[in-house]
Amino acid sequence: MPELAEIEVIRLALEPLVVGRSLRVEEIGPHDMRARGEGRGTGRTKAWIDAAGLLDGARVSRLERRGKRLAMVAADGRVLVVQLGMSGQLMLAPDAAATHRHVTWRVSRQRHPLVFRDPRRFGGVTPYASPETLREAWDADLGVDALSVTGPQLAAVLRGTRFVKALLLDQRAIAGVGNIYADESLFLAGIDPRTRCAKVGRSRAHELADAIRTVLRRAVRTGGSTLRDHRTALGKPGQAQQLHAVYGRSGEPCVRCGALLRSATLAGRTTTWCPGCQRRSGAVQEG
């Protein structure tokens, strides 16, 4: 599933290609894929999104991102948010697959179309009436962006008895971290994912915030993690998966200490960690 790093890779690549240029909706796919209400509360009500809502005829003034959500903001105030879900792709490339296309735009002065596709159909698009409406919705639904999270911000939400891994996956607490980068960040910070939030002290919260930013920036620099579907906006696979220290490596030796990596299901997700490098403060005791 695309996480913050993959969405940021797409934003950075698309920015010079679409900002300042006009969009024309060339093709609209299944309406249920595009059925997302506007803002919090109405987001549960499916509604048809017409070409105007898809920024037909609009000039893109900027691209914004918070967490895993990407917004195209038009000069006339219209906003369209794209969520890639599990397998979504947003690319301006000649090799964008013809199947599972949900919206295709023609971009002025660009040879290739901009395509949003999602084979597994967990993604979608959401129109907003204005940038102010967008920010209100994001402030209501999303926590601080993980790429800029600070130690004090993270310490403020590290409360209660749930596992720190579960907290990192909560988009209302910190936006953008998913299963891959939660595992990688906890490893870099040396924190056992089973540690209770209340047991993570202020100094360790600062270390974890630093680790989150470091892991995400490294992933962005290397094009994001391509495990299956992720492609950059130019249709290329990322290389960040080659840097994974723990994610997907259960039973293999730790790259740092050589201990065999362990895994368990936490917060409904497979979680991998090193028993030698990641401290167990407040963690569940083994039975």
Give a label for each model feature.
Residues A96-A98, A140-L142, A146, H230, ...:
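Short linear motifs in intrinsically disordered/low-complexity regions
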Residues M1-T133, A137, G276-G287:
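Acidic, proline/glycine-enriched N-terminal capping motif
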